[in-house]
C-alpha cells in the first residue's frame, strides 16, 4: 500500500508534496519522496506547525508557526483532524504562491460541509449538538473520539444505518457507539 502511494510523490505525478509528519507513513514519505516536500505537524518542528491548540464544539484555534512568522488561526470546524486539514491547506496554498498570511486568514472564513462534524445551533441551551454522516465503524469511532475531547458531561450518540446499505456493519456500529458514547 505504501509503495503504491509513494508513486504519487514522483516527478511524473507532482511538483511538490505537503506531508503530515505526525503520521509514521508521512514521516517516512517526507524522507523518501522524489520531489520537494513541505511538512506539517502539531507534535514536532515542521514547515507548518500548530501549537497552543484549543478545541470546542465551535471549532479549533491554534498558533500557526512557520520558519519566519506566527499567526493565530481559527477554523469553525470542531475536531483534531481540522488542525491537520487546515495545516495541509495552508501548505497547499503557499505551494501555489499564496502568502501564508492570506491562507491563514482565509481559514477563519471557512465553514464545514453540512453533515460533516457540523455544530448545530442549540439556541443557548447548555449542551452541544454535532451532526456527522459517519457511515462506517471507523468514521463513527473517529467522530465520537473527536467530540469526546470537548464534552464536559455525557456524550449521547444517536445514529442510524440507512436502507439496505451494508447490514453487516450495523452490529459493529452499535458496538462502537456503546464503547465510545455514554
PLM features: what roles do these ranges have?
Residues 19, 131, 159:
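Active-site flanking residues adjacent to catalytic metal/cofactor-binding acidic residues
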Residues 43, 134, 160-162:
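Histidine- and/or cysteine-centered catalytic micro-motif in compact active-site loops
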Residues 88, 135, 139:
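Conserved cofactor-binding/catalytic machinery of classical short-chain dehydrogenase/reductase
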Residues 113, 138-141, 145-182:
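Active-site beta-alpha connecting loops in nucleotide-dependent enzymes
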Residues 117, 132, 157:
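Hydrophobic, well-ordered secondary-structure elements that form the walls
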Residues 128-135:
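Switch II (G3) loop of P-loop NTPases
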Amino acid at each position: 500500500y505504501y509503495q503504491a502511494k509513494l508513486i504519487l510523490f514522483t516527478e511524473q505525478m507532482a511538483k511538490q508534496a505537503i506531508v503530515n509528519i505526525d503520521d509514521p507513513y508521512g514521516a517516512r514519505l517526507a524522507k523518501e519522496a522524489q520531489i520537494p516536500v513541505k511538512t506539517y505537524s502539531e507534535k514536532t518542528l515542521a514547515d507548518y506547525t500548530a501549537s497552543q491548540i484549543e478545541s470546542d464544539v465551535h471549532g479549533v484555534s491554534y498558533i500557526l508557526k512557520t520558519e519566519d512568522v506566527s499567526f493565530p488561526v481559527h477554523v469553525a470546524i470542531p475536531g483534531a483532524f481540522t488542525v491537520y486539514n487546515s495545516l495541509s491547506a495552508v501548505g497547499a496554498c503557499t505551494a501555489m504562491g499564496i502568502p501564508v498570511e492570506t491562507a491563514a486568514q482565509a481559514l477563519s472564513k471557512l465553514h464545514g460541509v453540512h453533515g460533516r462534524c457540523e455544530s448545530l445551533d442549540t439556541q443557548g441551551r447548555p449542551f452541544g449538538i454535532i451532526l456527522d454522516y459517519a457511515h462506517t465503524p471507523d468514521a463513527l469511532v473517529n467522530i465520537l473520539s473527536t467530540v469526546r475531547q470537548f464534552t464536559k458531561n455525557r456524550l449521547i450518540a444517536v445514529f442510524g444505518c440507512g436502507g439496505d446499505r451494508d447490514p453487516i456493519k450495523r452490529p459493529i456500529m452499535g458496538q462502537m457507539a456503546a464503547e465510545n458514547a455514554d
